[in-house]
Curated annotation (Swiss-Prot):
Residues 79-93 are annotated as: Leucine-zipper. Gene3D superfamilies: 1.20.5.170. InterPro entries: bZIP (IPR004827), bZIP_Maf (IPR004826), bZIP_sf (IPR046347), TF_DNA-bd_sf (IPR008917), Transcription_factor_Maf_fam (IPR024874). This is Transcription factor MafF. It is found in: Nucleus. GO terms for biological process: in utero embryonic development; regulation of epidermal cell differentiation; skeletal muscle cell differentiation. One of its GO terms (molecular function) is sequence-specific double-stranded DNA binding. Residues 51-76 are annotated as: Basic motif. It comes from Mus musculus (Mouse).
């Protein structure tokens, strides 16, 4: 098997170019501006220039991907925190709503009892002494809280 002297010479030249390639660390390669990189790559073969530029692009993309992952994790944690806070608020509002419903039911019961009482008093006095339901409702004492409405409405 004969070795072509021309091809071995080309291989030797290629190895020499590789040996003359500036040894840049990954950090240095990424840290260079494009202008500085091009200045450092002057005199190298097109293949070496392409290889180094591709390596730089790969390293930069890797860094961008890592920072994107970190950002996504931080956003996810923040959203989970907000979700927990909102769930606590929903639970609190549900408890308040249930308490208000119980209070409303109790007030409805009192209102109906008073209306029944007013009807029985009116029936005992006769048709001439009918008491309007609104006048009965206005005499009901309510628990301290918001001021009673000036024009009370029926219980339903």
């Amino acid at each position: 098997m004969a070795v072509d002297p021309l091809s071995s010479k080309a291989l030797k030249v290629k190895r020499e170019l590789s040996e003359n390639t500036p040894h840049l660390s990954d950090e240095a390669l990424m840290g260079l501006s494009v202008r500085e990189l091009n200045r450092n790559l002057r005199g190298l073969s097109a293949e070496e220039v392409t290889r180094l530029k591709q390596r730089r692009r790969t390293l930069k993309n890797r860094g961008y991907a890592a920072s994107c992952r970190v950002k996504r994790v931080c956003q996810k944690e923040e959203l989970q925190k907000q979700k927990s806070e909102l769930e606590r608020e929903v639970d609190k509002l549900a408890r308040e709503n249930a308490a208000m419903r119980l209070e409303l039911d109790a007030l409805r019961g009192k209102c109906e009892a008073l209306q029944g009482f007013a009807r029985s008093v009116a029936a005992a006095r006769g048709p001439a002494a009918l008491v309007a339901p609104a006048s009965v409702i206005t005499i009901v004492k309510s628990a301290p809280g918001p001021a009673p409405a000036a024009d009370p409405a029926p219980c339903s």
